[in-house]
Amino acid sequence: MSQFQVPLAVQPDLPGLYDFPQRQVMVGSFPGSGLSMAGSESQLRGGGDGRKKRKRCGTCEPCRRLENCGACTSCTNRRTHQICKLRKCEVLKKKVGLLKEVEIKAGEGAGPWGQGAAVKTGSELSPVDGPVPGQMDSGPVYHGDSRQLSASGVPVNGAREPAGPSLLGTGGPWRVDQKPDWEAAPGPAHTARLEDAHDLVAFSAVAEAVSSYGALSTRLYETFNREMSREAGNNSRGPRPGPEGCSAGSEDLDTLQTALALARHGMKPPNCNCDGPECPDYLEWLEGKIKSVVMEGGEERPRLPGPLPPGEAGLPAPSTRPLLSSEVPQISPQEGLPLSQSALSIAKEKNISLQTAIAIEALTQLSSALPQPSHSTPQASCPLPEALSPPAPFRSPQSYLRAPSWPVVPPEEHSSFAPDSSAFPPATPRTEFPEAWGTDTPPATPRSSWPMPRPSPDPMAELEQLLGSASDYIQSVFKRPEALPTKPKVKVEAPSSSPAPAPSPVLQREAPTPSSEPDTHQKAQTALQQHLHHKRSLFLEQVHDTSFPAPSEPSAPGWWPPPSSPVPRLPDRPPKEKKKKLPTPAGGPVGTEKAAPGIKPSVRKPIQIKKSRPREAQPLFPPVRQIVLEGLRSPASQEVQAHPPAPLPASQGSAVPLPPEPSLALFAPSPSRDSLLPPTQEMRSPSPMTALQPGSTGPLPPADDKLEELIRQFEAEFGDSFGLPGPPSVPIQDPENQQTCLPAPESPFATRSPKQIKIESSGAVTVLSTTCFHSEEGGQEATPTKAENPLTPTLSGFLESPLKYLDTPTKSLLDTPAKRAQAEFPTCDCVEQIVEKDEGPYYTHLGSGPTVASIRELMEERYGEKGKAIRIEKVIYTGKEGKSSRGCPIAKWVIRRHTLEEKLLCLVRHRAGHHCQNAVIVILILAWEGIPRSLGDTLYQELTDTLRKYGNPTSRRCGLNDDRTCACQGKDPNTCGASFSFGCSWSMYFNGCKYARSKTPRKFRLAGDNPKEEEVLRKSFQDLATEVAPLYKRLAPQAYQNQVTNEEIAIDCRLGLKEGRPFAGVTACMDFCAHAHKDQHNLYNGCTVVCTLTKEDNRCVGKIPEDEQLHVLPLYKMANTDEFGSEENQNAKVGSGAIQVLTAFPREVRRLPEPAKSCRQRQLEARKAAAEKKKIQKEKLSTPEKIKQEALELAGITSDPGLSLKGGLSQQGLKPSLKVEPQNHFSSFKYSGNAVVESYSVLGNCRPSDPYSMNSVYSYHSYYAQPSLTSVNGFHSKYALPSFSYYGFPSSNPVFPSQFLGPGAWGHSGSSGSFEKKPDLHALHNSLSPAYGGAEFAELPSQAVPTDAHHPTPHHQQPAYPGPKEYLLPKAPLLHSVSRDPSPFAQSSNCYNRSIKQEPVDPLTQAEPVPRDAGKMGKTPLSEVSQNGGPSHLWGQYSGGPSMSPKRTNGVGGSWGVFSSGESPAIVPDKLSSFGASCLAPSHFTDGQWGLFPGEGQQAASHSGGRLRGKPWSPCKFGNSTSALAGPSLTEKPWALGAGDFNSALKGSPGFQDKLWNPMKGEEGRIPAAGASQLDRAWQSFGLPLGSSEKLFGALKSEEKLWDPFSLEEGPAEEPPSKGAVKEEKGGGGAEEEEEELWSDSEHNFLDENIGGVAVAPAHGSILIECARRELHATTPLKKPNRCHPTRISLVFYQHKNLNQPNHGLALWEAKMKQLAERARARQEEAARLGLGQQEAKLYGKKRKWGGTVVAEPQQKEKKGVVPTRQALAVPTDSAVTVSSYAYTKVTGPYSRWI
């Protein structure tokens, strides 16, 4: 219709006509989606000049608006190239004519209301196309028009003439005003225009019907289904009867006939389940529908005409004809096409009675006579006045697609289409349509009443009603909730305009509908535009094509509006008309609804509206432009259109107008319009031509011809701008053949597309695009951007875009409001473009102002004090991060509280280049006295006590540098810094609260079962949250408000005891060094509030403590002036210490031996380890005797075995140990079962060891804190956190279990001296044996000494932590140890590993193997012992001793067993390889060898000792767990573990092993992960005996290390390893030597003044507020972190995103799980059907990562089973292991595979 308008507009001679074009402009210009109102102002002004891009007035509010809203579709979908809806020039949005008309049609508030509504709707919906006001208005305006028409629906007759011209010609403000104008506009001029419009509408309808046949067909079929299920329903209902009739009418005869033809030609409805090429019931139903429609049409149409002239079809037909004629005269083509011809064509094509056809024509004429709405109708009328009327509904949908064109037609089309539509929608659309129509207008009743209503006014009124209803409807749609209400509204409104309403139903479909439809359509369109700017653009293209039917398009909008607008008009026949109309619009509204929501009910039309997205897409078509549909697509579209009885579906579901495929896409995007969507599908499914032809196969070609002829005539008369096919074309295609007509029209449209009015045909969808429409929004530039692309491929492009827009914009904008929350940059002219990269992140919820002084005022007002109480510091964003060479946090400037007078510190950033209202923003607020001192003191003590004992450290990526190699938290797992999270936080898994599936979430969960402690913690945090919230509200009210928005809804996810709960979670960081990061998961516009608690020595103002933690902003530097611009004052601050300018930031470089593993890696390893652990356990069960033997050999050392296990666990820790004492400690502890440690660093090192362990859960490096309780680890639980010493190897910390340390110690010793390491291990083992026996690493300290003492008790008696310390410190002792090691001690070393195995005395036994091993390693047994060989020897001794001589023979010990002489070198590597995978071998030979050899040892496991070793290792190795276990266990306490401990643990004392391992996360499981890498390191540390050890370290590959250790063993690496170990330790920064050697000043940061590093020194009880999501922040590492007595506890309160569901989102989760369960069940059924095995089925059905892993591992287990021949000792291992050593050396695969 819009297109019609445009063409009309082209003719300046015809004011009314031009008014129409203006209106058309509305339709086709930017303002309206595709409605005339959408026409650009130029169109308004220039009539046909719609294509020209009009200029912004520059004076209206939108023009003066400088910033984009960011929420509209134009903003969100930049591809549309549309200006922000809120910035769209009002002038461009409105057509001059439209405005006038709007004024004329004040009744409905057409112009203003429509515009406003449109704009509003557009804004609300994020107009898709161009400026909200313009295009949006266009769409919405139509709504307004529709309403205005509705309001003036009654007056339509009277006002029709004036309104008609106004609508047609006055079209500037066509959208809303047009319809009113219709009423007011002069009849003649308007009539002419109306006729043109009607022709265009008819053409549009035809094209649309054709293009939307699929949609129509789908709708019809749906209606059919509905009716079959509830036969009487739609068609027969009273009020609905009207709609039902409309349904029938709505599904015009053309539609029904088209559907019938398609059905007969084998084009079954999309949803048809019938077998065979046809759907008998459907055919029968269609035939019956057609008959009823014809009957109904005869009656209704007469009624329609009745309102115009008589009340009968005959009269209406004549009336319509006259109107048409008048219109035609204006539009020569139309005149050329006699009404009778149209009637005949309609009757023929639609298979309706001539009387009905005449009635339709009469209505069309009436519509023509009426203002533009009438014109619109006439247009439809011309081809098939009434027939088109049914298409009006159809068009209405189309108008949704391309509202401008269809809206006009839809009214008429609705009427004439009512029968066809009815025929078509009855399946589905009808019901929907009826409801929709009900909303819009009752088609049946309208028809009946139409004749009764004033003929002239009625059509106009009807159009108006349609528009009104449509606009209401659209509005409703926009407000989705209103959708249904809109329907009712439509009914009510329709009744409101009784006179118009009665005819309105028919007219709305026919004449009135066109006018109202465009308006309604525009509104709907606007809504849709908002939702789918791009789609709308495409639609606009279509609309522009349909431009001719500008009036028609308004009609289409009427259809949209009918829900609301028609209400006023349909008062007289609200029920029937509504219903009938609903059915007709059902195609559109319903279709739209279907498309968008996928709802089928007729009422859904409103629903469709609700689903503004889908609808938007459809209206988008009309508003932006009628999409140019290609000829081929035209048939498809037609088909769709035909299928959906009403063109409305097509227009409504823009897709319908588009080519079938695009249409489908559109429909898919807007499934809410069932009819539309299905029609689209239908359109696609059947051939386009078929779709066109179904209604009247014969007429279809004629329709094409007629359309072309009409187009030519229109073109000739109105210029290309009027590229609207003649009325005949419309009639032909109108009802069913609207599609038919459309095909031809499509071509014509396509042909005209280049002109002012673009007639684009896609299948059944004909889009008349007026550049006006686009112009308004920047014309085609704005909307066309999308539209044009679609225009080129037309359907294809459009569909693609709409789909994309539906999927993307609709989905992302509507479905994901998350982005809507994202604030946009304030609009300012300060800089051309805001680049956060240069000026820093932009946000203002902490506060902002034009100057720093304004910030002071702001903060003084908030805080309530002035002067010195408020301190403001300026910082400058440089973007250069200050960090140490290792990537750890540093500070260059420290801002401290200078005096007690200072209460509030505020850091502000001046945005470079800005002088606007937000030139200065607050980035940090620090209240020095945030909480009472007493509360702070109490909290510090309570939290320290509780978390030290029961805390379960959280693994955080920010705890490590980018390389994951730093140990900033410290290396002692028991004391290293750690963070503990409580409360609710966002989970990627749930995309919501992590407690989504927790029936009874423990928000303050501690390790183990400690409800009392948890309650204490809960109370502490709840009280604190309650205390802090008011301060937060006072200091950052906006951020606070943002965080309490959803408090009531998600109260379960909030902390605090009083109303006003901004926080959801809290993280307690105890001496935790957070590396530079942003809290990405925080609420977008929220903040983190950090409460700081400091140690007793740091609670005074002005005193700088020895150690402190600073909060750093790494990207900022201090300004050289103070807040007042004084450089002197700033210098004075520096001099007084208020600002401390650092020249260096010396910090010990603490480094992990190997990079910490990522959570993903840990998880994968944990899974593997768990799987292997199970295997190992099974193996243990299978070889319990051997294990027992080993245990027995370890005998008295049973506890030792436990310790060994622990040691093994700890061994994993060894890895870190290599780096530093803490490493050793850590390693030991970690493997001791420190999940955190393992998972963190060691885990990284020993992939197998931690896989199962809890550690895997932690991202911390091995060095990172282990759970204080270590309750996870059975053994560790006894000892408090210190006992565990999870993380690191705080060599200095004897707290670490000595046992762990022991192993770790020997590991350290390895560091210091390879030999020492092993001896250390030995001693540790001895010590650990008991310790492990004790199962408490905490006891390890003393026991650790024994462990060391075990062999080197004196050796490194570093005391309790000799292990770790020795690692680091006792280099000499280590060497000494090494010496010993070579001797018995070496054996012992191995022994202590082995010691557990009771083979410490097996030097000879081992010696033999050792030499082998050594040989392999390139060492003599003693050398080996001393180097790694020493331990090897020791191991050998142990191995040999305890073992199985064969195994021993093969390997020195269990581990050596692995190495059995035969396979020693190769085997070790082999096993190492395997183990390597498990990390065992890589650990050091001392332990690692054990682990490795245990690989063989596992075979050797048959030996008591060997088996112990082997088996323990086996578990590690075999189960991956074995390897891991062995690795970690061996590493930390690998030897003990490997030898007897492990043995005992695995077999003899599985409990211990479990305990140890359990804490580790699996007896061997955990160890393996840590073991591999840690073992390696441990080996290095210890063993570094393998000169390669270090290499291994360097490689950090468990495998490599495993190999290296052996290799090292091969080669003398004793000293080098020691050095390496030391070095590593140093690297770790754990060793004292390391500390001395590895200190860094981060000098490079201080050489460049632009490198950032502004830090604040938070005081005790202070509250710091910052936007952690946007600002990069960090906390500096402490010199001596000790979470048992933390230097600083920072309690970080935050609220993560998406925590806005009640009960943590449990309902959503359960629903999701139910769905997944159903899917899984389906998969299982499918698997069963396919005959897949259980495992295969699992893999096939669900991706349980376990499935593949478990399956694969079991296979490996089988191999292991063979390896269980591990028990076969050397024999199988010799050949197989050798091969496997290399062939199977895999970092990822557990050695257990081969064991």
Swiss-Prot record:
Transmembrane segments: none
Protein name as catalogued: Methylcytosine dioxygenase TET3
An MF annotation (GO) of this entry: RNA polymerase II cis-regulatory region sequence-specific DNA binding
Ligand binding (substrate): N1082, Y1694, Q1695, H1696
Record: residues binding Zn(2+) 3: C828, C830, C916, C984, C993, C1053, H1704
Substrates-to-products reaction catalysed: a 5-methyl-2'-deoxycytidine in DNA + 2-oxoglutarate + O2 = a 5-hydroxymethyl-2'-deoxycytidine in DNA + succinate + CO2; a 5-hydroxymethyl-2'-deoxycytidine in DNA + 2-oxoglutarate + O2 = a 5-formyl-2'-deoxycytidine in DNA + succinate + CO2 + H2O; a 5-formyl-2'-deoxycytidine in DNA + 2-oxoglutarate + O2 = a 5-carboxyl-2'-deoxycytidine in DNA + succinate + CO2 + H(+)
Ranges annotated as biased composition (Low complexity): 416-425
Cofactor note: Binds 1 Fe(2+) ion per subunit.
Sequence position, cross-link Glycyl lysine isopeptide (Lys-Gly) (interchain with G-Cter in SUMO2): K491, K1188, K1219, K1397, K1561
Tissue: Expressed in colon, muscle, adrenal gland and peripheral blood lymphocytes.
Record: residues binding Fe cation: H1077, D1079, H1673
Reported effect, A1076T: In BEFAHRS; decreases methylcytosine dioxygenase activity
Name of the coding gene: TET3
Annotated source species: Homo sapiens
Region listing for Interaction with DNA, in residue ranges: 985-998
